[in-house]
């Protein structure tokens, strides 16, 4: 059955992620509401894959809000580290004794990459949307942006690993790109574009 939700709960308290997805979903006429504004606690993320964690977060947000929900699980997969940190990206720096933060994640990554010549990496995003906590047919979209880890921070836009993710085809990092340019190329932008198409055909038709 098709539906046209006017509000969609975002299962994240990350302000950068909320702003980015709000811009990407504006064309649907749907208001994205951060789960924190509804006093919804963060869900557990016990799984080893992005899709399982995103689904768990979406179901959790929908269960506690009674609204359709969307969740993003994203991370950095570094070739030289056999695909890690992966689903543990947000906590990457904590294994090296740093408090959890974007700044410390970037600092720890650059420190661990000193002397590493294989700098290829991918930022991966998986978006999952559910109509209800029991939705048997969640919408799933993925995006992947491949680049190279820089040796220093470049650019002051964006968030997360944007200042260290060099995109060779553009000759700059995500943090050096205007928002519209980044959204067209980024992992989250790719996933959001695919999710928009799914929603338009399945929920809004």
Task: Name each model-derived stretch.
Residues 3-9, 15-33, 37-205:
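Anionic-ligand binding patches
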């Amino acid at each position: 059955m098709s539906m046209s939700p006017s509000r969609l709960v975002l299962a994240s308290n990350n302000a950068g992620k909320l702003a980015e997805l709000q811009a990407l979903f504006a064309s649907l006429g749907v208001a994205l509401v951060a789960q924190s504004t509804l006093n919804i606690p963060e869900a557990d993320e016990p799984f080893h894959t992005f899709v399982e964690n995103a689904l768990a977060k979406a179901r959790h947000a929908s269960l506690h809000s009674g609204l359709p929900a969307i969740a993003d699980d994203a991370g950095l997969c570094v070739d030289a580290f056999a695909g890690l940190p992966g689903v543990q990206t947000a906590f990457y720096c904590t294994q090296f004794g740093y408090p959890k933060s974007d700044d410390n994640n970037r600092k720890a990554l650059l420190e661990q990459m000193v002397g590493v010549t294989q700098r290829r990496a991918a930022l991966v995003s998986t978006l999952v949307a559910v109509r209800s906590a029991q939705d048997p047919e969640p919408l799933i979209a993925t995006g992947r942006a491949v680049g190279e880890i820089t040796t220093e921070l470049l650019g002051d836009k964006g968030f997360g690993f944007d200042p260290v993710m060099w995109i060779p085809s553009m000759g700059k990092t995500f943090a050096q790109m205007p928002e519209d340019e980044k959204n067209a190329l980024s992992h989250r932008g790719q996933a959001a574009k695919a999710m928009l198409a799914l929603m338009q055909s399945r929920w809004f038709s």
